[in-house]
């Protein structure tokens, strides 16, 4: 386990990773520029959003696919006439943790290995959406969230993509270590730097919550959060996890799910997003202090969904 943890930390500290993904070399702006701090990503970037809803999709990625899904979700949210649920979205290399902003209760915990696509919608420019494979029945779900402004939607998208890249590289290291151990077992020898019988597999690491040494999910008692919007396809919105739920289960099949989703991506190592090169450059230059600045439009954000 120590070897895998060290590998994970090394990947996070990798200068090449920082330069490729986060436009490194801007350390003079720390800590204001969140894109240059690995600690921020490891601890989890937190965004305050409003949950629009969810719909099922047929494919794991695609700009047109996600745009059509978001259009359906927004139409359903508008038709319901209900206030949107305020949620907190925490993004880290472990995945997305969704909690109710008013009650602090856990709504859903999505493994980063099940996310296949994320985007800042082009038509509804304040909407962030992601597509993930359901743990229950392996169906593909598109979840959409209303942000206060376009640049927040872009920032969330870029953060999820970066978290995915870190997790993917960690997964690769884990897979290589596992293959070395299996080869050593077959040959009856030991692999230097590994312990054949005691080093856990990727699934065990994820199940015990040790991935990249991130903090454990709060274990406070949870109760059901009422739904504030109706969902497309009559699919129930994410429910609060019960006391006995294991967020990262041993038999979750994350390794297999991640391998399958990797085949659908343009580049297996990079999460497909709907961001253009200009969007990415703009989002990389953002500071969290910019997010609180009001838009020049002056539109009331509470009713913003009805202005689409």
Swiss-Prot record:
Residues recorded as bearing Phosphoserine in the entry: 14, 198, 201
Region Disordered: start-end pairs: 179-201, 288-308
Sequence segments annotated as region (AP-2 complex binding): 248-275
GO cellular component, one term: cytoplasmic side of plasma membrane
Role noted for this protein: Adapter protein (clathrin-associated sorting protein (CLASP)) required for efficient endocytosis of the LDL receptor (LDLR) in polarized cells such as hepatocytes and lymphocytes, but not in non-polarized cells (fibroblasts). May be required for LDL binding and internalization but not for receptor clustering in coated pits. May facilitate the endocytosis of LDLR and LDLR-LDL complexes from coated pits by stabilizing the interaction between the receptor and the structural components of the pits. May also be involved in the internalization of other LDLR family members.
GO molecular function, one term: AP-2 adaptor complex binding
Residue ranges annotated as motif Clathrin box: 211-215
Protein's name according to its UniProt entry: Low density lipoprotein receptor adapter protein 1
Species: Mus musculus (Mouse)
Domain notes: The [DE]-X(1,2)-F-X-X-[FL]-X-X-X-R motif mediates interaction the AP-2 complex subunit AP2B1. The PID domain mediates interaction with the NPXY internalization motif of LDLR.
Alphabetized InterPro entries for the sequence: Adapter_Engulfment-Domain (IPR051133), PH-like_dom_sf (IPR011993), PTB/PI_dom (IPR006020)
Deleted gene: phenotype: Mice are extremely sensitive to cholesterol intake. LDLR are expressed at normal levels, but are sequestered at the hepatocyte surface. LDL internalization defect is caused by the inability of the LDLR to enter the endocytic cycle.
Span(s) of short sequence motif [DE]-X(1,2)-F-X-X-[FL]-X-X-X-R motif: 256-265
Gene: Ldlrap1
Keywords: Acetylation, Atherosclerosis, Cholesterol metabolism, Cytoplasm, Endocytosis, Hyperlipidemia, Lipid metabolism, Phosphoprotein, Steroid metabolism, Sterol metabolism
Compartment(s) where it occurs, according to its Swiss-Prot or TrEMBL record: Cytoplasm
Xref: Pfam families: PID
Gene Ontology annotations of biological process type: amyloid precursor protein metabolic process; cellular response to cytokine stimulus; cholesterol homeostasis; cholesterol metabolic process; low-density lipoprotein particle clearance; positive regulation of low-density lipoprotein particle clearance; positive regulation of receptor-mediated endocytosis; positive regulation of receptor-mediated endocytosis involved in cholesterol transport
């Amino acid at each position: 386990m120590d070897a895998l943890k060290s590998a994970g930390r090394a990947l996070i500290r990798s200068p090449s990773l920082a330069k490729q993904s986060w436009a490194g070399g801007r350390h003079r702006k720390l800590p204001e520029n969140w894109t240059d701090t690995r600690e921020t990503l490891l601890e989890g970037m937190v965004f305050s959003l409003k949950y629009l809803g969810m719909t099922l999709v047929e494919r794991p990625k695609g700009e047109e696919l996600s745009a059509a899904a978001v259009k359906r979700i927004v139409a359903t949210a508008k038709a319901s006439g209900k206030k949107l649920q305020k949620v907190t979205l925490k993004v880290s290399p472990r995945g997305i943790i969704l909690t109710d902003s008013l009650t602090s209760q856990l709504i859903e915990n999505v493994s980063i290995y099940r996310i296949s696509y994320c985007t800042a919608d082009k038509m509804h420019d304040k909407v962030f959406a992601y597509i993930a494979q359901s743990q229950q029945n392996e169906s593909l779900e598109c979840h959409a969230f209303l942000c206060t402004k376009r640049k927040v939607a872009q920032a969330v998208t870029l953060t999820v993509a970066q978290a995915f890249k870190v997790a993917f590289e960690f997964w690769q290291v884990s897979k290589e270590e596992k293959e070395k151990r299996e080869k050593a077992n077959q040959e009856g020898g030991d692999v230097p730097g590994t312990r054949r019988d005691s080093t856990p597999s990727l699934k065990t690491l994820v199940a015990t919550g040790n991935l990249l040494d991130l903090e454990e999910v709060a274990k406070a008692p949870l109760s059901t959060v009422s739904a504030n919007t109706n969902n497309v396809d009559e699919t129930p919105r994410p429910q609060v996890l019960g006391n006995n739920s294991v967020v990262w289960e041993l038999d979750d099949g994350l390794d297999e799910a991640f391998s399958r989703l990797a085949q659908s991506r343009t580049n297996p190592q990079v999460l497909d997003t709907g961001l253009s090169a200009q969007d990415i450059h703009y989002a990389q230059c953002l500071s969290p202090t910019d997010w609180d600045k009001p838009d020049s439009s002056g539109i009331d954000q509470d009713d913003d969904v009805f202005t689409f």
